[in-house]
């Protein structure tokens, strides 16, 4: 192992319930759809917003409307997270592990499906730049055609720390 690739939402920061709540509200208000737990597991969690919106409304939305709804979802998510400080911390043990990696000069990156609009907010809430170079934080910029579990975003993250994905955990 030469480097470490981290997911973020739902693994290093336990915010999945907040994303699910925001998507459930968006689905109901904009598309009159009630999302089930199965819908969330199969079509929402870990997926970029563009793929989630394609699932909710396959062809009826303009690009402008998709962006508007995606931005609204992220605003709602941040409001939910900010209103409950219980969510605003790293997973137990993560800080110690990050300190160990940093001290031992182990390259590390984050690969997250989070929207670009959340990036500044995460940096305010979490000490990300203390542990990860700015260029090693890979987020959904709209260019990923496939959502997780597809390895595409992890491959990009490995390249950002100048490693082959096979040499990372």
Q: What are these regions, as identified by a protein language model?
A:
Residues 64, 108, 124-126:
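Intrinsically disordered, low-complexity boundary segments flanking structured domains
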Residues 13, 108, 145-147:
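A generic structural signal for short coil/turn motifs at secondary-structure boundaries
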Residues 2-95, 99-100, 104, 117:
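N-terminal helical cap/lid subdomain that shapes the substrate entry/recognition surface
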Residues 112:
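Short beta-strand/turn micro-motifs composed of small residues
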Residues 105-109, 166-168:
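Short active-site oxyanion
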């Amino acid at each position: 192992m030469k480097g470490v690739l981290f997911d973020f939402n739902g693994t290093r920061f336990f915010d999945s319930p907040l994303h699910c709540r925001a998507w459930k509200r968006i689905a109901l208000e904009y598309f009159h759809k009630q999302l089930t737990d199965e819908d969330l597991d199969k079509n929402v969690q870990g997926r970029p917003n563009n793929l989630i919106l394609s699932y909710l409304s396959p062809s009826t939305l303009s690009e402008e409307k998709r962006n508007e709804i995606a931005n609204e979802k992220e605003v709602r998510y941040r409001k939910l997270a900010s209103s409950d400080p219980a969510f605003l911390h790293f997973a137990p043990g993560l800080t110690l592990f990050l300190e160990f990696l940093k001290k031992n000069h182990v390259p590390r990156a984050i690969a997250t499906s989070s929207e670009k609009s959340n990036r500044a907010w995460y940096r305010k809430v979490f000490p990300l730049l203390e542990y990860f170079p700015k260029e090693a934080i890979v987020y959904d910029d709209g260019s990923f055609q496939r959502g997780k579990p597809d390895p595409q975003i992890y491959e990009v993250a490995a390249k950002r720390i100048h490693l082959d994905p096979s040499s990372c955990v």
